[in-house]
């Protein structure tokens, strides 16, 4: 049986908390849930603007402490893949947000399926994006 390894983007984490059935199912089925450092960074920035910062931090910490969740570091190989994706998309005239480029680079590096609610990941042919709108 194949191991299901996903990379969760920020939009999917938020959708999961809101009970989005497709995202919830993708997370429940996954053997390994990966995060790029941009995801907790974006989430923490959002928490700081809200009224429930402490509670949201607690929920995120509990999620990240799961034995199925793995935080992937950005290294030289990730940077090379970022540059390749950036150059490719810029050449096509279809750029995506910078943090999502890092997420795509991480997915490409480790062969992970990106679970997201953002359609722009589908512009990156080097990755598999599972989009839940």
Place the predicted regions along the sequence by residue.
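Acidic, PIN/NYN-like endoribonuclease modules and their adjacent C-terminal/linker elements
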Residues: 1-4, 104, 108-133
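Histidine- and aromatic-rich ligand-binding microenvironments
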Residues: 8-9, 36, 95-97, 118
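Generic structural signal for small/hydrophobic residues in well-ordered secondary structure
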Residues: 9-10, 43, 82, 107
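Short, well-structured N-terminal submotif of metal-dependent ribonuclease cores
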Residues: 1-39, 45-62
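Short, hinge-like loop/turn segments at secondary-structure boundaries
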Residues: 50-54, 89-90, 131-133
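Alpha-helix capping/helix-boundary segments
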Residues: 12-13, 78, 102-103, 120-121
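Active-site neighborhoods of divalent-metal-dependent phosphate/nucleic-acid chemistry enzymes
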Residues: 70-115
């Amino acid at each position: 049986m194949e191991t299901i390894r996903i990379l969760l983007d920020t939009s999917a984490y938020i959708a999961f908390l809101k009970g989005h059935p497709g995202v919830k199912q993708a997370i429940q089925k996954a053997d390994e849930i990966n995060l790029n450092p941009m995801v907790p960074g974006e989430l923490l920035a959002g928490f700081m603007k809200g009224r429930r910062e402490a509670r949201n931090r607690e929920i995120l910490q509990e999620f990240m402490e799961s034995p199925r969740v793995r935080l992937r570091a950005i290294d030289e190989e990730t940077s090379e893949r970022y540059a390749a994706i950036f150059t490719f998309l810029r050449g096509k005239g279809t750029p995506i947000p910078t943090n999502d480029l890092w997420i795509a680079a991480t997915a490409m590096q480790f062969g992970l399926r990106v679970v997201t609610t953002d359609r722009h990941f589908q512009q990156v042919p080097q990755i598999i994006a599972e989009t839940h709108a």
